[in-house]
Amino acid sequence: GAENAYILAKTPSILENNMPTIGDLTVAFWMRTTKNTSAQGLFSIPNSIKFWGNFDIFLENNNSETQAFFKVHIFNQTAKENDERWVEAKIDDIFGSEWVHLAFVYDGNTSTITVYRNGEGVFTKELPDCGKLKFNNVGASLAVGAFQFSTTPSLTSGAGAQTWAKNFPGQLDQFRLYDKVLTATEIQSIYSGKE
């Protein structure tokens, strides 16, 4: 990782076709970093006309040497137009010199998001009536290690770079995106297999 580095991953065609009505979602990756002092983008499924993406994961400042403050933003185009949801998850033992495996799982059947750390569920929150994910204005690229608006050029016409928002300077590896709910057993297998 580097302060101004990020990855733009072209949305795979199979996912690009399914992304607008993805329904369920799992994002899994390994990360290694030290305490953050600013908001740092980790992942974004962009919305090409809004400030926030369709699905964003980022670190917020928590003033802790080991506990990370993750924020997840979901912009779901359900029957309730512009259904915007926020999830705040404080997860222990993230910062330091060791690699940590994380998985963020959204289940559209239960409207629940679960966060796994090193193969174990450590946080769950229900988002009442959120339902299956439906995204609009999905861009051709996904942002890894950045907010959608902090890339050059910005992935959205809704905003440009923000002074409070930084790219992720730590390390990310084996980043995975699934259009389904991975089970606890599957996530444990990815973690224990060091995949």
Feature map (PLM): residue ranges:
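Extended recognition patches within non-cytosolic domains
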Residues: 171-195
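Glycan-recognition/cleft segments
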Residues: 43-76, 131-134
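Short, aromatic/His-centered strand-loop micro-motif at the edge of beta-sheets
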Residues: 73-101
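Short surface loop/edge beta-strand patches of beta-sandwich-type extracellular domains
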Residues: 1-25, 86-92
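Acidic glycine-/aspartate-rich tracts in secreted/extracellular proteins
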Residues: 33-37, 77, 108-110, 120, ...
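Flexible glycan-contacting loops in extracellular carbohydrate-active proteins
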Residues: 126-170
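Short hydrophobic/aromatic patches on beta-strands that form ligand-binding or substrate-lining surfaces
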Residues: 27-33, 102-104, 144, 172-177
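Short tryptophan-centered beta-strand motifs in secreted/extracellular beta-sheet-rich domains
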Residues: 98-106, 115
